[in-house]
């Protein structure tokens, strides 16, 4: 019985998710993350939309949450910084809670949706000030979980490099 279940979990049977709306939002998010604040509102708006594929919901929620934390970082007023960051962290918590085994088989830009969601969460948790939001330990735990995942071996090199970069940021933050 276990042998019959094994092929279904292999990357060869993974379902690629093609979602032009996600690709556009991801491009906006990437530019916003690199400092182009004008792209942030577009990313938030697109990630707020219901994905065409309902299985993509955790991925959308994780990126929406991360975009909100970027909005918090860019806000001028302290209460807005807190409001947006808290809203973002709540969205990420929801995304992580929605992950199911089928997200291991759904590919988003060549990466299992479960890994993509966890990396966005971990990167965000490591980036927010730990003295205020107390998320560094959760980020560290997610990074360790991804390192132990058998799915990581089949993930694209770019994804693994991003994981390495988040781990390096964590080590720097812990100094």
What is each model feature region?
Residues 1-9:
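Bacterial N-terminal signal peptides
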Residues 14-71, 75-107, 145-175:
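N-terminal alpha-helical interaction modules that lie
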Residues 63-71, 116-128:
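Short N-proximal segments of mature Sec-exported proteins
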Residues 84-87, 135-141:
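Structural signature of tandem alpha-helical TPR/SEL1-like repeats
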Residues 108-109, 133:
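Short acidic, glycine/proline-enriched loop segments that cap or flank alpha-helices
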Residues 110-120, 161:
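Amphipathic alpha-helical protein-interaction segments enriched in hydrophobic
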Residues 119, 140-143:
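Hydrophobic, well-ordered secondary-structure segments
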Residues 128-134:
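Outer-membrane beta-barrel transmembrane domain signature
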């Amino acid at each position: 019985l276990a042998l019959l279940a094994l092929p279904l979990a292999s990357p060869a049977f993974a379902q690629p998710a093609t979602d032009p709306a996600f690709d556009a939002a991801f491009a906006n998010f990437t530019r916003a993350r690199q400092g182009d604040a004008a792209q942030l509102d577009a990313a938030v708006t697109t990630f707020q939309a219901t994905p065409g594929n309902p299985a993509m919901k955790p991925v959308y929620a994780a990126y929406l949450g991360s975009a909100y934390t970027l909005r918090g970082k860019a806000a001028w007023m302290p209460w807005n910084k807190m409001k947006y960051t808290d809203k973002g962290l709540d969205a990420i918590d929801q995304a992580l809670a929605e992950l199911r085994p089928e997200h291991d088989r759904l590919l988003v830009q060549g990466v299992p949706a479960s890994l993509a969601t966890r990396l966005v969460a971990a990167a965000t948790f490591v980036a927010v000030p730990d003295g205020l939001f107390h998320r560094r330990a959760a980020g560290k735990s997610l990074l360790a979980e991804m390192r132990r995942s058998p799915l990581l071996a089949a993930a694209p090199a770019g994804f693994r490099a991003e994981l390495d970069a988040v781990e390096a940021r964590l080590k720097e933050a812990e100094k």
